[in-house]
Amino acid sequence: MRPLKQAIYSSRTADKFVVRLPDGMRERIAEVARNHHRSMNSEIIARLEQSLIQEGALGEELSMRLDSPELSLHERELLQRFRQLSHRQQNALVSLIAHDAEMAADAT
């Protein structure tokens, strides 16, 4: 089992899918995304991913254990420190990293 790699891509190359939202849902998603310091897209992706993880649909690779031999020492330390953060801090950090990755991809 290989560790999950975070794909770096720009919005131009990302897979796109149109979703029809019920009345008022767009505004609710926007508000929640603001509270989590994320874009609406990042909020939707995070919630879909969490739902799929809970159902077991994304497989074991996303539930990497700290004692996994596939984790390097640095990855293990990052994961351990990440898990010590509050949920809000985790969301902010993930949002920051995703934003930086998008900016780097757009610069190329």
From Swiss-Prot:
Pfam family, one: Arc
Description of the deletion phenotype: Deletion shows increased swimming motility, decreased biofilm formation and very limited ability for competitive colonization of rhizosphere.
Source taxonomy: Bacteria, Pseudomonadati, Pseudomonadota, Gammaproteobacteria, Pseudomonadales
Any one GO biological process: negative regulation of DNA-templated transcription
MF term (GO), any: DNA binding
Organism: Pseudomonas ogarae (strain DSM 112162 / CECT 30235 / F113)
Function: Functions both as a transcriptional activator and a repressor of multiple genes encoding virulence factors as well as genes involved in environmental adaptation. Represses genes involved in iron homeostasis. Modulates intracellular levels of c-di-GMP which in turn regulates swimming motility and biofilm formation.
Assigned keywords, A-Z: Activator, DNA-binding, Repressor, Transcription, Transcription regulation
InterPro entries, per database record: Arc_DNA-bd_dom, Arc_rbn_hlx_hlx, Ribbon_hlx_hlx
Protein name according to UniProt: Transcription factor AmrZ
